[in-house]
Amino acid sequence: MATLQQQKIRIRLKAFDRRLLDTSCEKIVDTANRTNATAIGPIPLPTKRRVYCVLRSPHVDKDSREHFETRTHRRIIDIYQPSSKTIDALMKLDLPAGVDIEVKL
């Protein structure tokens, strides 16, 4: 019995700026919908919060510290039944430099 394997592209996006990430997701979903592919998402994943603790004084005061944090926002978009037009359109898509994109076929 042969199973019907469905083609799928999974796109994982990461960024420090949430607004940049959301506009990139909108562009990807619009591009997929224009080429008659089915786009599911963007699905928000948990935000990673990284806190750095730094001494304020270069010399002795260990009691005085400062905290900095970075937040990494993540999204997943699944594109089902992509055609060659879909892949070409996604490759030509101009996205901001602050967004990390990972594509799995």
Swiss-Prot record:
InterPro entries: Ribosomal_uS10, Ribosomal_uS10_CS, Ribosomal_uS10_dom, Ribosomal_uS10_dom_sf
Alphabetized PANTHER family for the sequence: 30S RIBOSOMAL PROTEIN S10 FAMILY MEMBER
SUPFAM superfamilies the record matches: Ribosomal protein S10
SMART domains: Ribosomal_S10
Upper lineage: Bacteria, Bacillati, Cyanobacteriota, Cyanophyceae, Oscillatoriophycideae
Protein name: Small ribosomal subunit protein uS10
GO molecular function: structural constituent of ribosome; tRNA binding
NCBIfam families reported in the protein's UniProt record: PRK00596.1 (NF001861), rpsJ_bact (TIGR01049)
GO biological process, one term: translation
Function: Involved in the binding of tRNA to the ribosomes.
Keywords assigned: Ribonucleoprotein, Ribosomal protein
Record text on subunit structure and interactions: Part of the 30S ribosomal subunit.
Pfam family of the protein (one): Ribosomal_S10
Similarity-based family: Belongs to the universal ribosomal protein uS10 family.
Gene Ontology annotations for the cellular component aspect, listed alphabetically: ribonucleoprotein complex; ribosome
Keyword set includes Ribonucleoprotein: yes
